[in-house]
Curated annotation (Swiss-Prot):
GO terms for cellular component: cytoplasm. GO terms for molecular function: acyl-CoA dehydrogenase activity; flavin adenine dinucleotide binding; long-chain fatty acyl-CoA dehydrogenase activity; medium-chain fatty acyl-CoA dehydrogenase activity. Its cofactor is FAD. The keyword Lipid metabolism applies. This is Acyl-coenzyme A dehydrogenase. Belongs to the acyl-CoA dehydrogenase family.
Length: 815
């Protein structure tokens, strides 16, 4: 009985940790339990004495502070890693949303389900159905990318007229003031037609003068610039990146010096600016330049501080000395992008966004706005492009036949088709969920990094899959090619607004560990202010959190999450439970990694990357489940849900395993493996059978397939190859029953080619009606249009054709 009572005590302690019961109530429960066993004479009353001695220093706050918290604070202050001003501002900027729940080890799934489903207003829907549809119709991507290297003038005029560049600008300034969800849907639709079109519209509606002015501009700046930006009278760009500072934007060498100078015939307080920027979208044609630079005030004209820090200003590009106009040539996706320079240019101090009082506040301004823009523009462009490619390649795989069958029925093709379908569904779910947070007023900095990374990364891999399936159809550029420009341009999204290698290795977990953790940010703040009381509260909350995560990880590992709470009882129930387990694992290993590695974790980028991978996969899986919930739990969509969640669970577990195999302290890693994987690994990648289901969903018209391509431009217009493929798919499907009947009558399988000739002969023999003959002929025309590739005159492809000189007439000499 004594052994059983000790086991019961250990179970009781574990239950208290598992449910995160506070220290005072836990101490009371343990004392009552011990007293009860002592009263039953199973234990001696003397057992209470050591228990009280252990608990008193923990529950008496003044004693706890002096014995534990104060010494711990001194140690923490000595080992806390140095943090630059830009790092601190990046961490302080923005908010924590759903990713915080996932990081803390016990997600509140009901809270996730209760987040409002984003909806379009009638005005937003009308804009998408009208002006956006028309802009898509006007866009000829081959003309844009190959012939003009720009949008045609009439499309530029249309975008300005319909205020495409003013989606984020408030109505009081003449803007559209659309929601984040509406912006995402607009960009997705445009991206499915032309990457250049989507980038051109997306950038002014992301991080740029419009966004910065609305948040930080003076009233005079707002009233002057915002109406002009809304009308398209001003074309904005924002210059941050320098040749010497790409991903390390805080190291920009561009400078401004506060001084007095002459401006329009008067001596005014201003700045002398010198900059050299590159990769700046819209810079070649911009009329107003948003500029980030490091401002200094050596003469103390603004105050006592000399090095004020990163500052943002608006510079009209007609200002003497401003250099714009040259262009970069990014991967045959020639959107307006180029360098800008200026040397010792004097401008008034009022050019600072927000006026002189915002001098030195530029980095905070940028990271606060970036968390919103990065969560909308790049994920939407990547997702929209893939949604259209998915529809096109699904139709093509059905139409294209080899060895007398549709290539989409071949297992080798089904595998990449499934990845395309699954990733399209997951990416759209992830991009949609973050817009919910933004519409609720959140600025989820960590989540925007997750969505940017995984949408662009998965999008690139999926477009590569589509190119493999398309083969020669995808290789040959021309108006009929629906995949090659997306394939060429995918690295652009990978690179910009935080290169993906940097984002994965440093940002997702680097910021997440501090922002999303329930106690680390408070501990750091207490350490910086040397506040023992605040540190005591955070420290003991942190210790309880670690204990809870360890108990939860071990128990949920033994049961594979089966005892944990879920919001539903259907076939997705187990997914919530398995995510509960992985969330607890992440919480535990994050604390262990920070505790063991300390400040060196900043330099252990592969450890940080794997922890970030776990957090990312938790988000992608939960976004997939949220989408399924928001769309009414359509059972026909379950294969997509199964694939998305199973893939995320498998990748998260793989990251856990890789983390433990490569953890620098092998003893700690071994102990953690016992806690996290008490019965070994349990998750598998999606099965071949599930891949087969997804491949079929992508090829055959259905409500589920329509949801995969929701909101895209699928009209079969002249310059929309995806829309033409969609129409061809319907034509081919309509012809198949007729072809099958004729094959049966012929007693053999007739080839699904030359259907027009088949129709002619069958009609002459009275085997089919005129209507059926017309269907076969139409299907043949659509089939040939779908599988053929573009061809050009030999001289049409050269940018600068070589003019051949007339050959000299050769004279033959007599022998």
């Amino acid at each position: 009985m004594i052994v059983l009572s000790i086991i019961a005590l250990l179970v009781l302690i574990s239950v208290l940790f598992y449910h995160r019961v506070n220290l005072y109530l836990s101490s009371l429960i343990l004392l009552v339990y011990t007293a009860a066993l002592s009263a039953s004479q199973l234990w001696s009353f003397w057992v209470l004495l050591p228990l009280v001695i252990m608990l008193l220093p923990l529950i008496l706050t003044p004693l706890r502070k002096s014995l534990f918290s104060a010494p711990a604070l001194r140690i923490f202050r000595s080992v806390m890693p140095a943090m630059s001003r830009t790092e601190k501002e990046a961490i302080d900027a923005g908010t924590t949303w759903w990713e915080g729940d996932l990081f803390r080890g016990a997600p509140d799934w009901k809270k996730l389900h209760n987040y409002p489903k984003p909806q379009l207003t009638a005005e937003e829907q009308a804009f998408i159905d009208g002006p956006v549809e028309e802009a898509c119709r006007m866009a000829n991507d081959f003309q844009i990318t190959h012939e003009l290297a720009d949008l045609p003038p009439e499309l530029w005029d249309y975008l300005k007229e319909k205020r495409f560049f003013a989606m984020i600008i408030k109505k009081e300034y003449g803007g559209l003031e659309f929601s984040a969800y509406a912006q995402a849907r607009v960009l997705q639709k445009l991206a499915g037609v032309s990457g250049i079109l989507a980038i051109t519209v997306g950038v002014p509606n992301s991080l740029g003068p419009g966004e910065l002015l609305q948040h930080y501009g003076t009233e005079e700046q707002k009233n002057h610039y915002l109406p002009r930006l809304a009308r398209g009278d001003e074309i904005p760009c924002f210059a941050l990146t320098s040749p010497e500072a790409g991903s390390d934007a805080g190291a920009i060498p561009d400078v401004g010096i506060v001084c007095m100078g002459e401006w329009q015939g008067k001596q005014v307080l201003g700045m002398r600016l010198t900059w050299n920027k590159r990769y700046i979208t819209l810079a070649p044609i911009a009329t107003v330049l948003g500029l980030a630079f490091k401002l200094s005030d050596p003469e103390h004209l603004l105050g006592d501080t000399v090095d004020l820090g990163i500052t943002c200003a608006l510079i009209p590009t007609h200002t003497p000395g401003v250099e714009i106009g040259h262009r970069h040539f990014p991967l045959n996706i020639p959107f307006q992008n180029g360098p800008t320079r200026g040397n010792d240019i004097f401008v008034p101090i009022d050019y600072i966004i927000g006026g002189p009082q915002m001098a030195g506040q530029g980095w905070r301004m940028l990271v606060e706005c970036l968390s919103v823009g990065r969560g909308i523009t790049l994920p939407s462009n990547a997702t929209g492009s893939l949604k259209s490619v998915a529809m096109g390649i699904g139709a093509y795989a059905y139409i294209r036949r080899q060895f007398k069958i549709s290539i989409g029925k071949m297992e080798g093709i089904e595998e990449p088709l499934a990845r395309i379908a699954g990733n399209t569904y997951v990416m759209d779910a992830a991009a949609t969920l973050i817009t919910s947070g933004i519409m609720m007023g959140e600025k989820p900095a960590v989540l925007s990094a997750i969505v940017k990374y995984h949408c662009t990364h998965r999008g690139q891999r999926a477009v590569m899959d589509a190119m493999d399936i398309a083969g020669g159809k995808g290789i040959c550029l021309g108006p009929a090619n629906f995949v090659a420009r997306g394939y060429q341009g995918a690295p652009i999204g990978i690179t910009v607004e935080g290169a993906n290698i940097l984002t994965r290795s440093m940002i997702i977990f680097g910021q997440g560990a501090i922002r999303c953790h329930p106690f680390v940010l408070d501990e750091m703040a207490a350490a910086q202010s040397n506040d023992v009381a605040a540190f005591d509260k955070a420290l003991f909350g942190h210790l309880g959190h670690v204990g809870s995560s360890m108990v939860r990880s071990f128990w949920l590992g033994l049961t594979n999450g089966r005892t944990s709470a879920t919001p539903v009882k259907d076939s997705t129930r187990r997914y919530y439970q398995q995510l509960n387990r992985l969330s607890a694992n992440l919480a535990l290993l994050s604390d262990v990694s920070m505790g063991v590695l300390g400040g060196s974790l900043k330099r252990r980028e592969r450890i940080s990357a794997r922890l970030g991978d776990i957090l990312s996969q938790l988000y992608l899986a939960s976004a997939t489940l949220k989408r399924y919930e928001d769309e009414g739990r359509q059972k026909e969509d379950l294969p997509l849900v199964h694939w998305g969640v199973q893939d995320a669970l498998y990748q998260a577990e793989q990251a856990l395993d890789d983390l433990l195999r490569n953890f620098p302290n092998s003893v700690i890693a071994g102990l953690m493996r016992v806690v996290v994987f008490p019965l070994g690994r349990v998750h598998r990648a999606p099965s071949d059978h599930l891949d087969h289901q997804l491949a079929q969903l992508l090829q055959v018209p259905s409500a589920t397939r329509s949801r995969i391509g929701r909101g895209q431009y699928l009209t079969p217009s002249e310059f929309n190859p995806v829309g033409l493929l969609e129409a061809a798919l319907l034509d081919v499907i309509a012809a198949e029953p007729i072809h099958k009947r004729l094959s049966k009558e012929a007693g053999k399988s007739l080839p699904f080619t030359r259907l027009d000739q088949l129709a002619k002969h069958a009609l002459a023999e009275g085997k089919i009606s005129a209507e059926e003959a017309a269907l076969l002929t139409k299907a043949e025309n659509s089939r040939l249009r779908s599988i053929n590739v573009d061809e050009f005159d030999a001289s049409a492809l050269a940018a600068n054709p070589v003019v051949k000189k007339p050959a000299k007439q050769q004279q033959t000499e007599a022998a």
